[in-house]
Amino acid sequence: MRNWIIGIAIAGGIYAASTVMRADRDETGAIVDEGSIDAFEMRVGDCFDDGSTFADDNPEVNSVAGIPCSSPHDNEVYAIFDVNVTSFPEGDEMARMAFESCKERFTSFVGKDYDSSALDIATLYPTRESWNRQNDREVVCAVYDVAAAKLTGSVKGRAL
């Protein structure tokens, strides 16, 4: 059993991309040069470093530090889906719902059951504000090494 689960809310609002270098992608959509990725433009297979993404004093995420998966990195996006409820969940229900839904998608991407894996789950999910103002329903599921070791290459199908 994991000691903690990271859940971060995707912030509403617009990220000032003009002040930060954006990640470059090739024709397949894979990141080839590191840079900023808007939280709403993340894709399955994107790798990124923590930076301040999962800081306790930074509960809202506008962007992440995208990095090619061939370089050492902290996280990899393995699923993105929309929450299928009509009203914003109360209390910790959004975090619980996001985690459980990400856990259901874990094995098919990683190739190993969550409970026996060396990887853990990080979730990014809507805030009440982004839910109401932007009709944000998107949840992003990412994996990271439970021992905080850097990952190299995609974890897809590697049964780590």
What are these regions (language model features)?
Residues 3, 17-160:
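Primary mode marks residue(s) on the alpha4-beta5-alpha5 output face of response regulator receiver
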Residues 1-8:
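N-terminal Sec-pathway targeting helices
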Residues 10-18:
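Hydrophobic h-region of N-terminal signal peptides that target proteins for export
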